[in-house]
Amino acid sequence: MFTTAFAQREQTQPGGLPLDLFAAIDSLKKELNAVILAHYYQEPDIQDIADFIGDSLQLARAAAKTNADVIVFAGVHFMAETAKILNPEKLVLLPDLNAGCSLADSCPPKEFAAFKAAHPDHLVVSYINCSAEIKAMSDIICTSSNAVKIVQQIPKEQPIIFAPDRNLGRYVMEQTGRDLVLWQGSCLVHETFSEKKIVQLKVAHPQAEAIAHPECESSVLRHASFIGSTAALLQYCQTSPSQEFIVATEPGIIHQMQKLAPNKHFIPAPPINNCACNECPFMRLNTLEKLYWAMKNRTPEITMSEDIRIAALRPMQRMLEMSN
């Protein structure tokens, strides 16, 4: 008699995919002693099957604490790199290696090295949305959850470079009163939101609160009643008495908002053009099918040189220490 697991493997679609992907992935998790970490911007099916869902800081903490042998990272490349930096002995898989990040790509290591050399007395605080090479050139890493807190802990006389996101950098400057030297990078998704259309939505929905991620441009942030990381936005929509929200961040988060506040209404902030530009094309590269094949074949694997990993680990550890 076939075992249940064997029978499930036999029930396949054309191309070899199991009929029940959820069950097959669950079986592979047990077989590999794997954990699935997913960002809030992933598609709903991936969020639902993940062992842990979070923002960049939460995911970094989860990666640092996991006892799993295999980390399957449903996110983008820099997030999976972060997991590898913290867990060199573990197998770290990314369902699609092409799942990059426009913000990380906006800060090429060679150009940033020259920028850093032009400011030799500056401390480098880098947003976690950057490559391992940029992390290795940094003194402290931060996330949108803790960027303000991190900068507030740095002595006021210490000049700071903030990279790579200029919009988050401006927000941190406003919140701390510090004068930061900003690298001029940005996220293509968070720069597509239309201020005009958000104002029109607020007129059409006068009871709705606009909430926004600090990667948005200041023209959008000025219309938000609350600004915060993805985790903070989720918390706010649960505790706010408002019943309707205009959400200025990647709309994948609305899946969790609806689960956590099912009686409330969430409106994705529209982009400038009539397109799906407010959806991150890189996050959308990951699918349940790719996640299955990554676990089945134990590839694509995240790798990096040990020199880069060790250099990138130090500012990551400083962040975790300073954000406790």
From Swiss-Prot:
Q: In which broad location class does this protein mainly occur, judging by the first location in its UniProt entry? A: cytoplasm
The answer to whether keyword GTP-binding applies is no
Needed cofactors, names only, are:
[4Fe-4S] cluster
According to the record, cofactor stoichiometry and binding are noted as: Binds 1 [4Fe-4S] cluster per subunit.
Q: Where does iminosuccinate bind?
A: 39, 56, 127-129, 144, 213-215, 230
**Record GO terms (molecular function):** 4 iron, 4 sulfur cluster binding; metal ion binding; quinolinate synthetase A activity
For biological process, the GO terms are: 'de novo' NAD biosynthetic process from L-aspartate
Keyword Transferase among record annotations: yes
Catalytic activity, as annotated: iminosuccinate + dihydroxyacetone phosphate = quinolinate + phosphate + 2 H2O + H(+)
Pathway field: Cofactor biosynthesis; NAD(+) biosynthesis; quinolinate from iminoaspartate: step 1/1
| One Pfam family per UniProt | NadA
Q: From which domain of life does this come?
A: Bacteria
Q: Per its UniProt record, what HAMAP family does this chain match?
A: NadA_type2 (MF_00568)
Q: Into which family does the record put it?
A: Belongs to the quinolinate synthase family. Type 2 subfamily.
What is the protein name stated in its UniProt record? Answer: Quinolinate synthase
In the UniProt record, the gene name given for this protein reads nadA
